[in-house]
Amino acid sequence: MDAEQRSVFQGIVYYYRENMVNCRYQVTLKDAVDGALLQQALDAARAKASYYFQKPVWEKKLLHLEPSDAPCPVRQGSAKPEFPDENGFTVALSYEGKVVYFDWFHFLADGRGIAPFMTMVLQFYCNLRYGTAFEGQTLETDPAYDIEDILAKYPESQVANDMQRPVVQTFEETPTCCRIRLEKAGLVDAALRCGVKPFSTLTALLCKAVRAYLDKDEVLYSYSTDARDALGAPNALYNCVASFQRKLPLTADAPLAEVAVGVDADLKENLSAERKLFRIAEQMGWVYRVYQQKASLSIKKRIFQMGEYISGFPADFWVSYLGDPFRPSSPELTRYIEDFQTWVPADGASIGLECTSLHGIITLCVKNKVPRPGFAEALRAAFEAEGIRVLEAVELGEDLT
């Protein structure tokens, strides 16, 4: 696989999925957005971030990226764009009222990969609107990792891997959305009582809520980790996610500490560089086999989806915790930002939860394909049972995006 092929392989899986996985960062500023200034900020950031403005082009059943000087206009309104857009891009910017929307096709980048670009656009906007003096560093991505090298290092990953797991039946109804906000301090206190990381406590509480909501004695959950450290690519702007899965037998009266300790032990085991690389080999090995097929994209999609389904990839829920969404972290920038939300399709699970932290509040943005009401209240009940203050638990209705 040459360098050009490696540069698209990191995200090629999102062309094999049944549905487009388009992501959205939703940022509420302290004042109404000035569209003209936002366009200037985008143009200034683009000059320092050419990676995001390459066009994916299909030729002879292969995909490659081409640089483009086509315009990228800021749009008014909250409607999500189709990707690629009319200029061939897979990233878009729009606004409405006080809210700025950053949309992108997951093929281009994961959340941490898009965050430096989003941060720089907001910094340049604040320079123009509020007279701040953010500089903005040129964003250059590390070279793409070589999946063939990783597979050669871990040949056993393709022998006893996901392809032998039992299939979990997921719900695939029209998604609905809900949003939960809770005090971060309360979650941290609960984690201290359990003697584990806050993310482990959060995941344990999600397991308890999902168990009650789905009325299941066993919950299968997935969580994502950033694998840039393991890949030796700290400045990668492309997808670098290693996803892990765990099956958890659970009773209604299971103490939080007991559940959280098990979650935490699993998490710690999987945070090592060796485990992340092995997992990359497992999850991308099937992608590589499909990629190597001399077939059309439509045939590759069918092959991939069948293999992924029987591999046991689907889960009851997945959770992704971005934490501070800005790269680099900037207390000065957040003075001008009131709220931050992350919305991603619940691909590969019945329920998908994206979690971010801002101003001492953790916001959970949930897309739910289970055709029954009550998940927001199930989450509220799980958090409040442990003394964590819930500031909001609201059902937002059908996902029309």
Regions found by a protein language model. Name each.
Residues 1-61, 68-92, 211-401:
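Acyl-thioester-dependent acyl-group transfer interface
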Residues 2-8, 108-189, 383-401:
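Non-catalytic, low-complexity flexible loops and terminal extensions
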Residues 27, 103-106, 176, 190-191, ...:
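Generic anion/oxyanion-binding catalytic loop in active/binding sites
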Residues 31-49, 103-119, 180-215, 364, ...:
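Acyl activation and transfer enzymes in specialized metabolism, enriched
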Residues 84-89, 169-177, 194-196, 201-205:
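Recognition helices and adjacent regulatory flanks at domain boundaries
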Residues 84-128, 139-143, 147-150, 356-375, ...:
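Histidine-centered acyl-transfer/condensation active-site motif
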Residues 98, 187, 287-288:
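Alpha-helical hydrophobic/aromatic positions enriched in membrane-embedded helices and signal peptides
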Residues 121, 125-129, 210, 267, ...:
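Short, well-ordered alpha-helical segments in soluble proteins
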